[in-house]
Design a protein with these regions (language model features):
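Peripheral, non-catalytic segments flanking oxidoreductase cores
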Residues: 1-99
């Protein structure tokens, strides 16, 4: 899990640098503030045998961090909410990440 978490963090840092460059600001404008931040690698780790079908493990929530990243899940249910409060299922292709 440490290697996977490290790769996900590197992806976030790279995306933040790319965003800064694209906005015409210093390359480290975001990453300098991300250093030492409260980064959390939090696999749900839920025991699906203990709960009924349809149980929600992580409902609608607000992330407090600058970026959120997800890998492909082994179970269905990852959704995002559009600005007009429409729920949309997320399908992450193999080998890709959702940022």
């Amino acid at each position: 899990m440490d290697l996977w978490g490290k790769m996900m963090m590197e992806c976030c840092f790279t995306a933040a640098e790319m965003a800064a460059i694209g906005m015409g600001i210093d390359k480290d404008a975001f990453t300098s503030r991300m250093q030492g931040g409260p980064h959390l690698l939090a696999p749900t780790g839920s025991d699906l045998l203990r709960y009924d079908v349809g149980t929600t493990f992580a409902g609608f929530h607000y992330d407090l961090n600058f970026l959120t990243i997800h890998g492909k899940a082994r179970f269905p249910g990852l959704s995002v909410w559009l600005r007009k409060m429409k729920k949309v299922a997320v399908k992450i292709p193999p080998g890709c990440l959702l940022l």
